[in-house]
Each structure stands twice: as structure tokens, then as C-alpha cells.
From Swiss-Prot:
Necessary for efficient RNA polymerase transcription elongation past template-encoded arresting sites. The arresting sites in DNA have the property of trapping a certain fraction of elongating RNA polymerases that pass through, resulting in locked ternary complexes. Cleavage of the nascent transcript by cleavage factors such as GreA or GreB allows the resumption of elongation from the new 3'terminus. GreA releases sequences of 2 to 3 nucleotides. This is Transcription elongation factor GreA. InterPro entries: GreA/GreB_C_sf, TF_GreA/GreB_CS, Tscrpt_elong_fac_GreA, Tscrpt_elong_fac_GreA/B, Tscrpt_elong_fac_GreA/B_C, Tscrpt_elong_fac_GreA/B_fam, Tscrpt_elong_fac_GreA/B_N, Tscrpt_elong_fac_GreA/B_N_sf. The keyword Metal-binding does not apply. It comes from the Bacteria. Belongs to the GreA/GreB family. One of its GO terms (biological process) is DNA-templated transcription elongation. One of its GO terms (molecular function) is DNA binding. The gene is greA. It comes from Streptococcus pyogenes serotype M1. Keywords: Coiled coil, DNA-binding, Transcription, Transcription regulation. Residues 1-71 form a coiled coil.
Amino acid sequence: MAEKTYPMTLTEKEQLEKELEELKLVRRPEIVERIKIARSYGDLSENSEYDAAKDEQAFVEGQISTLETKIRYAEIIDSDAVAKDEVAIGKTVIVQEVGTTDKDTYHIVGAAGADIFSGKISNESPIAQALIGKKTGDKVRIESPAATYDVEIISVEKTN
């Protein structure tokens, strides 16, 4: 069975690698030290410090595993390989809702780099899926769980 790939820009992959390094070289040793100290308190059956450290260790190891998988199966998307005005991962798109003056700016990223609070939307989101492959001037119907609406693509630029 083929493994799932994780489309992302080179910058996104580098950010994941940096996060992985932080977890392995800083967080993991800190937690091991906390576990060692908590063990020194004696009876582990009622040792909340030990339980908390073990829970954090499990969480961090899960994060490490997830990041390693995403990095291993990263599919680097070169936004320069698509037309300059075509929406793709690694591009910033400004859309205007048809019939209004409302404009929204989206940075299309791989799922691993999504951060809605900074305008970075996953290529797997309904908005991005509707926009990817379209060009400046195209009118697009976006169907999201919250609403269905039409937008016009005002501009498409490579994200820095």
C-alpha cells in the first residue's frame, strides 16, 4: 500500500525539521530529566509529578512520530513550476466575494503548515480545494460547511 504524501513547500518542510530537532534535542531530554527527578521521590503509584512527566513524554513522542512521518513522505511543491497567476501551494491569493467589496487573503500551504490565525490555509481545506488550479480573474464557487458563496480571484502571488 502506498503511503500518504504530504504536499508542502520547501520552507514548510524546513520548519517541520526545525520543530523536530527542538523536540528531540530539547524537549525530550527535559522530560527524561523530569521523570528521573520524579522517580527519586519514591512511590510511583501516587506520584503526580511522575504521571504528568510520563503523559508529556507520550505526547512529545507522538509529535515526534508525526513529524518524522510528514518529513519522510513530504512532497515538495515548487510554486515556480505553475503559471505565475495560478493558485497552488506556496501562493498567496486575494479573493473578493461576488457582489460585495469584501476581500480575503489566503496563503495556500500544505496541511502541515496550516495556521488559520495567520491566514495560512491547508491545501485540503474546502476553500483551497476550490481555488487550486484557478487563475486571476476566474470566478469560483466555494462550498464550505458554513456556507456556499462565489468569489473572484483578484490576484495570485508567490508567498515569501
